[in-house]
Amino acid sequence: AERPTPIYWFSSDEIVAEYADTVEISRDGNNYTIEKALLRPYFKPTKKAEKGLNSYSILATDKQIIFPYDNNGHLIRIDEMQSSYPGTYAYLLAHYDRLVPKCVSRDGTRDVPNATADTWYQYGRTQALTAFINTPKLIVGVLSKEPMYAMDTNDILIASGGTAGYCAVSKKDGSPYALEYIQAWLSNPITERILEIVGS
């Protein structure tokens, strides 16, 4: 649900108004209200200034993503979406034709395994959906020309897997190594060279 325009995420230039609990965005000539409780910061470098980051770049994003899941990674039920998040539900429903999975409608375009008529708005991929929620992490640029192991302490979501270009690394429970140490070790040119050799 990325082309021609993304559905789940938007940038700050699309926000036309902001209120205590909602933002109003402009999409396809219409304005939509999105509840802030379902929004998470989203790392997806699309502008020149956002690209070419390295390990010690300060991560910042002007993008937010609709995250219709609870902290355990369970999809928020459709009745709760309708009653507690009516603006977001109306927005997603307005884009039903682009979101409906193939297994729900023969007109569907997305591959979403196990989707039903009541879960049509779920993400196509859900692996590691909550693995890094409320967890400091390194965002790793998989296809970066320069080493990129950027520290994230702001709970930024990333697209990972496939050709997304990013994955995340967090400190293992019980590890004696601080995340900053892991970042420095991974960013070392010798370590990077070893990873290049092993990875090719």
Regions found by a protein language model. Name each.
Residues 1-200:
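Polybasic, glycine- and aromatic-enriched phosphate-binding surface used to engage nucleic acids
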